[in-house]
Amino acid sequence: MEEKILSMYAKGMTTGDIKAHIQDIYGLSVSDTTVSRITDKILPVAKEWQQRPLESIYAVVFLDAIHYHVRSEGQIVKKAVYIAIGLDLDGRKDVLGMWGGENESAKFWATVLNGLRNRGVEDTFIACTDNLTGFDTAIHAVFPETEIRVYEKTL
């Protein structure tokens, strides 16, 4: 049952949705606390993945954010998930990381880029971005030789 709950959680279902789904499909009653206890087990694994060492050089790094609205304390607020995808020198893609934020900003991206450097990235040849104001400055502050390409469609 834990695997089913984790699978539903990974697909973005809320604790309440998971609880209702388990009741509807399996006829079992589980508490919010039980669902939370099970889903909390993946947090250390996710943290370890987010902090893992990275390759020293990437041919291309794609940097983008996905924007969405969530309900928080009775209000609808805008959030962003930042994502960095690297293409290594052998042509393999790797999700370098994902970070949550309030909204997309060059300042937050500078923090992300410094985090990539701290995890072992020494250089990237090309950075593909959405032309966010100040993004080029943030990239060149961390990776001064990187060529910047602007894409027309987001990831």
Task: Name these PLM-found stretches.
Residues 1-12:
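Short, amphipathic alpha-helical "recognition" segments used to contact nucleic acids or chromatin
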Residues 3, 16, 125:
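Short alpha-helical basic/polar micro-motif
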Residues 5, 18, 35, 64:
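Conserved hydrophobic/aromatic pocket- or pore-lining residues that grip, position, or stack substrates
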Residues 16-27:
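DNA-recognition alpha helix
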Residues 25-28, 37-129, 133, 137-145:
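RNase H-like nuclease fold core
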Residues 143-155:
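Inter-helix linker motif
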